[in-house]
């Protein structure tokens, strides 16, 4: 099926992360990532990205539903191995990954 990763859901049907990454979505000018109480990993890259995101975007930790993936404009995955990755598509939805993704890549490169 040519999948690179799988999205994981908790028992409440909320998205928590993928098999190896934290997940962030951009919905208008607001970045959302699942809260720790939903079951995601509290990784070091997640913490760093949250601090970077707050410099430019409105930010919330809130539950993400599968429907939210249909309305957001970007989906970003992160972990300490590769940093950030922009997702091109999930099911039939295509994402542009032009704003948040580029901002995070540039911000991380400036830290190096």
Language model features by range: what are they?
Residues 1-8:
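Short, basic/aromatic recognition patches
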Residues 12-112:
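Conserved catalytic-core subdomain
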């Amino acid at each position: 099926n040519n999948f690179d990763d799988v999205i994981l859901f908790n028992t409440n049907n909320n998205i928590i992360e993928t098999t190896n990454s934290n997940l962030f979505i951009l919905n208008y000018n607001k970045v959302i990532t699942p809260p720790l109480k939903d079951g995601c990993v509290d990784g070091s890259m997640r913490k760093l990205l949250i601090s970077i995101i707050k410099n430019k975007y409105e930010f919330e930790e809130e539950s993400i539903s599968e429907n939210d993936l249909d309305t957001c404009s970007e989906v970003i995955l992160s972990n300490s191995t590769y940093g950030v990755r922009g997702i091109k598509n999930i099911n039939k939805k295509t994402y542009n990954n032009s704003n948040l993704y580029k901002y995070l890549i540039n911000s991380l490169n400036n830290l190096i």
